[in-house]
Amino acid sequence: MEKREQLYAGKAKSIFNTDDPDHLVMLFRNDTSAFDGKRVEQLDRKGMVNNKFNAFIMGKLQAAGIPTHFVKLLSDTEALVKKMDMIPVECVVRNLAAGSLVRRLGVQEGQVLNPPTFELFLKNDALGDPMINESHVESFGWATREQLARMKELTFKINEVLKDLFAAGNMLLVDFKVEFGLHKGEVILGDEFSPDGCRLWDKDTREKLDKDRFRQNLGNVVESYELVGQRLGLTF
């Protein structure tokens, strides 16, 4: 597999074409951003940690019957993925109140949400990824009603699989965001799953082990990511 020209560069990853029209190379960089890209720093080893973490999680999800774009690791910072048409919508599940939900609704951080909430956000950096609803998705043609229903179904299934996985490592899956795309007409999981895109707390101490350590200047960001992985049995 030959990596060719860069197709896209996001906040923390770059996507490259390959000599195979059905596959892309996803490069995890050390860039770490917050507040819609207003703050960006380089954190040593982060690209490697997130790449290996993502590969591990994608493997667990695939084993649970959830289709993903992940194919295999290529290097410490690169993965081979299926080429697909991304749906410009983020799906967010919240098991406990945190982040923007607390700010929007004035609820207590850590409040258990039963049942978990499901939210949609438009992927648009210029607009700050605004919250949208299911009618918007269908009316603007970002996804069909059937595709959105499948995205919602898969997101809740991901939640059940990963809640149990992190619980085994004495961690709480507070919330997470996932993105989907279409591959040969099928809705499959795309992008990544890492502590960059979810909230994880230690079950006993409620210590934050995710990107909030960067947002809130708590320090030891990559070390916390590695700790999460180690609790799941990963080695970096």
Curated annotation (Swiss-Prot):
<dbReference type="InterPro" id="IPR050089">
    <property type="entry name" value="SAICAR_synthetase"/>
</dbReference>
<dbReference type="InterPro" id="IPR001636">
    <property type="entry name" value="SAICAR_synth"/>
</dbReference>
<protein>
    <recommendedName>
        <fullName>Phosphoribosylaminoimidazole-succinocarboxamide synthase</fullName>
        <ecNumber>6.3.2.6</ecNumber>
    </recommendedName>
</protein>
<keyword id="KW-0547">Nucleotide-binding</keyword>
<dbReference type="Pfam" id="PF01259">
    <property type="entry name" value="SAICAR_synt"/>
</dbReference>
<keyword id="KW-0658">Purine biosynthesis</keyword>
<dbReference type="GO" id="GO:0005524">
    <property type="term" value="F:ATP binding"/>
</dbReference>
<dbReference type="GO" id="GO:0009236">
    <property type="term" value="P:cobalamin biosynthetic process"/>
</dbReference>
<dbReference type="GO" id="GO:0004639">
    <property type="term" value="F:phosphoribosylaminoimidazolesuccinocarboxamide synthase activity"/>
</dbReference>
<dbReference type="InterPro" id="IPR018236">
    <property type="entry name" value="SAICAR_synthetase_CS"/>
</dbReference>
<dbReference type="InterPro" id="IPR028923">
    <property type="entry name" value="SAICAR_synt/ADE2_N"/>
</dbReference>
<dbReference type="GO" id="GO:0005829">
    <property type="term" value="C:cytosol"/>
</dbReference>
<dbReference type="InterPro" id="IPR033934">
    <property type="entry name" value="SAICAR_synt_PurC"/>
</dbReference>
<dbReference type="GO" id="GO:0006189">
    <property type="term" value="P:'de novo' IMP biosynthetic process"/>
</dbReference>
<keyword id="KW-0436">Ligase</keyword>
<comment type="similarity">
    <text>Belongs to the SAICAR synthetase family.</text>
</comment>
<keyword id="KW-0067">ATP-binding</keyword>
<comment type="pathway">
    <text>Purine metabolism; IMP biosynthesis via de novo pathway; 5-amino-1-(5-phospho-D-ribosyl)imidazole-4-carboxamide from 5-amino-1-(5-phospho-D-ribosyl)imidazole-4-carboxylate: step 1/2.</text>
</comment>
